[in-house]
A protein has these predicted regions:
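A short coil-to-beta-strand element that immediately follows conserved catalytic motifs
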Residues: 60-98
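Acidic, metal-coordinating catalytic segment for phosphate/diphosphate chemistry
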Residues: 1-6, 10-12
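Short, hydrophobic/aromatic-rich beta-strand segments within well-structured domains
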Residues: 6-8, 18-20, 115
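N-terminal functional modules and adjacent low-complexity/disordered segments of proteins
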Residues: 14, 18, 80-81, 85, ...
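Nudix hydrolase/Nudix homology domain
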Residues: 25-30, 87-171
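Conserved Nudix-box catalytic region and its N-terminal flanking loop in Nudix hydrolases
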Residues: 13-71
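Residue-level detector of short, conserved catalytic/binding motifs and their immediate flanks
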Residues: 3-5, 44, 112, 142
């Protein structure tokens, strides 16, 4: 069981979706959502919120990128902000989530992905922080990527292999 989020924002009248890329591990080369397994006593929504904060290493909503890190205190504070974004979106659009194709009946996947509006942010400074990290401040190097809605639709129809499996398996 797990959950994730694909944030979106409107920038200059264009809807864009936020994905991440990694540089090591089994997800290299894919566009990936922000998600993972349910934590102890977590529901889907709480998991998606926490995973976004952890996987962006608290940088996305940080005012000062120089102090962003994945400490318990910073994660806890950012979770409150991301919960507000979820509430703002889902209170108006409660069905802006979908399930992952469960796959085989013997081992069905139980996954929920939310589509939540976030404030648009230029991500180049965040990507530079990850790229220039030499002292291990961050857990894993990532790169954030904004994908315009029309390009995401093209990926689904023409190049679904560029999307991480749980993204391309959304129902």
């Amino acid at each position: 069981m797990g959950a994730g989020v694909i944030p979106f924002a409107v920038d200059e009248g264009e809807v864009q979706f936020l994905f991440q890329k990694t540089f090591s591990g089994r997800k290299v080369g894919y566009l990936i959502d922000f998600g993972g397994g349910l934590g102890e006593a977590e529901d889907y929504r709480a998991t998606a919120v926490r995973e976004f904060v952890e996987e962006t290493e608290t940088m996305y909503l940080a005012d000062d990128l120089g102090v962003a890190c994945r400490s318990e205190e910073r994660v806890r504070r950012q979770i409150a902000h991301v919960e507000e974004l979820f509430e703002r979106t889902l209170s108006v659009h409660p069905h802006w989530w979908c399930r992952r194709d469960p796959g085989t009946p013997e081992n069905p996947k139980d996954w929920r992905t939310y589509f939540i509006e976030f404030p648009f942010r230029d991500i180049s400074a965040l990507n530079n922080e990850w790229k220039s990290d030499t002292d291990g401040r961050f857990k894993k190097r990532r790169e954030l990527v904004w994908i315009p809605a029309h390009k995401l639709l093209e990926l689904y129809s023409r190049s679904p292999g560029d999307l991480w499996k749980r993204v391309r398996q959304l129902e």
